[in-house]
Curated annotation (Swiss-Prot):
Pfam family, one: DnaJ
Cofactor remark from the record: Binds 2 Zn(2+) ions per monomer.
CDD domains: DnaJ, DnaJ_C, DnaJ_zf
Family annotation (SUPFAM superfamilies): Chaperone J-domain (SSF46565), DnaJ/Hsp40 cysteine-rich domain (SSF57938), HSP40/DnaJ peptide-binding domain (SSF49493)
PANTHER family associated with the record: CHAPERONE PROTEIN DNAJ (PTHR43096:SF48), DNAJ HOMOLOG 1, MITOCHONDRIAL-RELATED (PTHR43096)
Subcellular location: Cytoplasm
NCBIfam families linked: DnaJ_bact, PRK10767.1, PRK14280.1
Source organism per UniProt: Macrococcus caseolyticus (strain JCSC5402)
Domain of life: Bacteria
Any one Gene Ontology cellular component term annotated for this protein: cytoplasm
Name of this protein: Chaperone protein DnaJ
Length: 372
């Protein structure tokens, strides 16, 4: 199978800058990373993107590729025999030079580009689900020319330079001698079309950039990094092809007092020394409101209670997580004289001879002037 053009893989033109190449690689590699994208061909696309970037990000390799195409990546082209994998055999090299193999019809329908949108949602929206409206800046079909690229009332002709093929034959000297290869037509840009007059609104592209409002249903239980696909909400297709898709990636904001890990949530319960020592019945917050929790006498800091199925529901509907309540016993910082006196009595009964210490500089100063 003939390899795709590296610039095409990254969605770029041949004159793309280093920054454009890097930006395209970061966007596409994130989109097709096998850990994020679970589609069957995601891994193959990810490898193809990485291979294209490896060549186009290196000045020497890029220059060789720009001159000789995929054939320039072989061992005879000065790369020290580096194996890029999947480049095919000797037939593929000559196929790329002499125009063998399948050619893409410039007028064939092609699917539009996919888009990605980073969406912030509150903790509650992620837990319970929500419906929100987002504004996406994207290319849409030009409504003046209906996507044709031609000024209304004018004709579209077959490109006189390439005869509608979208490519032209070029002869050049290579390590294999003088060969004939194919290049994108410089006059029609590969479309195979020639406009009598380009659309005054879109300049002949058939597209315009607009900010479009799209309704998004946030699934209950969604977490940071998870995404949904909105079919057909990407960029418009080419030559009547289907539109691309829009991938919405969620970022869940922090909650005031709940932490989350997967479907489980965590809450820190502060107790006084008396509550922890004597036990108590307290109210703790859950996702649906407050519930009563019994604290046994002698509870220590770090003690964890489990509230079964009080966590977040699984985003796919497979059950629900738990809520974990962790105790933190709070030592009093400011006490009345009576409170301090009772603690001294407790220490004495408990058999502890305590050497009291001031809590801060002002207490030290106060005790100094009192002669303590």
């Amino acid at each position: 199978m003939a390899k795709r053009d590296y610039y095409e893989v990254l969605g770029l033109s041949k004159g793309a800058s280093k920054e454009e190449i890097k930006r395209a690689y970061k966007k596409l590699s994130k989109k097709y990373h096998p850990d994020i994208n679970k589609e069957a061909d995601a891994e193959d696309k990810f490898k193809e993107i990485a291979e294209a970037y490896e060549v186009l990000s290196d000045d020497q390799k890029k220059a060789q590729y720009d001159q000789f195409g995929h054939a320039g990546m072989g061992q005879g082209a000065g790369f020290g025999g580096q194996d890029f994998g999947g480049f095919g055999g000797f037939e593929d090299i000559f196929s790329s030079f002499f125009g063998g193999g399948a050619r893409r019809d410039p007028n064939a329908p092609r699917q539009g580009n996919d888009l990605q949108y980073q969406m912030n949602v509150t903790f509650e929206e992620a837990v319970f689900g929500a419906e929100k409206e987002i504004s996406v800046k994207k290319e849409v079909e030009c409504d003046t020319c209906d996507g044709s690229g031609a000024q209304p009332g004018t004709n579209i002709k077959t490109c006189s330079t390439c005869g509608g093929r979208g490519n032209v034959h070029v002869e050049q000297n290579t390590p294999f001698g003088r060969v004939r290869s194919e290049r994108t037509c410089p006059d029609c840009g590969g479309t195979g079309k020639e406009f009598e007059e380009k659309c005054s609104d879109c300049g002949g592209t058939g597209r315009k950039v607009k900010t479009v409002k799209i309704s998004v249903k946030v699934p209950a239980g969604v977490d940071t990094g998870q995404q949904i696909r909105l079919s057909g909400q990407g960029e418009p297709g080419i030559n009547g092809g289907p539109a691309g898709d829009l991938y919405v990636v969620f970022n869940v904001q922090d909650h005031a007092y709940f932490d989350r890990s997967g479907e489980d949530i965590f809450y820190t319960l502060e107790l006084s020394i008396a509550q922890a020592a004597l036990g108590d019945e307290v109210e703790v917050p859950t996702l649906e409101g407050k519930v009563k929790l019994t604290i046994p006498a002698g509870t220590q800091t770090g003690k964890r209670f489990r509230l079964k199925e009080k966590g977040v529901q699984n985003v796919h509907g497979y059950g629900r997580g738990d809520e974990y309540v962790t105790v933190k016993v709070m030592t009093p910082v400011k006490m009345t004289n009576r409170q301090a006196e009772l603690l001294r009595e407790f220490a004495e009964i408990d058999g502890h001879d305590i050497t009291e210490q001031p809590s801060n500089f002002f207490d030290k100063t106060k005790r100094f002037f009192k002669g303590e």
